[in-house]
Amino acid sequence: MAVKIKLQRLGKIRTPHYRVVIADARTKRDGKVIENIGIYEPKAEPSVIKINSERAQHWLSVGAQPTEAVAALLKVTGDWQKFKGIEGAEGTLRVAEPKPSKLELFNQALSEANNGPTAEAITEKKKKAREDKEAKEAAEKAAAEKAAAAESEEAPAEEAAAEEA
């Protein structure tokens, strides 16, 4: 009996999920299977590929022929290299980053809320008006300091004139 390792399609129209199965070569794509050895989800980022390496090695050793798609998956997981005795048996499988738990996200948001807002919640018009007001106040303060400095310079001259007289 000719045995193939092939993909059995599951899922809705635009969301395919596949099972990696061992089946007779003459059966339909979604027909009766001998054994289910893994899953493949191409729509996830990165793609989810889970294949039982031990069972894949067994079926390859007894002569099961993988389809082109399954052969590509076996190369990614490193099972094909292990079977052929080629270097690079670790494969090139990408692993998704673990999602942070909801409790961690909640605690992080809570700490950010306690620290206060990181950016000012002021519109551009109000911000510009406030900057103009601050600039006017700074100019008035500078003018007042200049006037006070000028008066203090004039005062010693008047005192010196009073002493001479």
Curated annotation (Swiss-Prot):
Keyword Repressor: no
UniProt keywords, alphabetically: Ribonucleoprotein, Ribosomal protein
Cited SUPFAM superfamilies: Ribosomal protein S16
Basic and acidic residues: bias regions: 129-144
Any GO BP: translation
GO CC annotations on file: cytoplasm; small ribosomal subunit
Biased composition (Acidic residues): 151-165
GO molecular function: structural constituent of ribosome
Region (Disordered): 110-165
Annotated Gene3D superfamilies: 3.30.1320.10
NCBIfam families reported in the protein's UniProt record: PRK14520.1, S16
Stated family: Belongs to the bacterial ribosomal protein bS16 family.
UniProt-recorded name of the protein: Small ribosomal subunit protein bS16
Upper lineage: Bacteria, Bacillati, Actinomycetota, Actinomycetes, Mycobacteriales
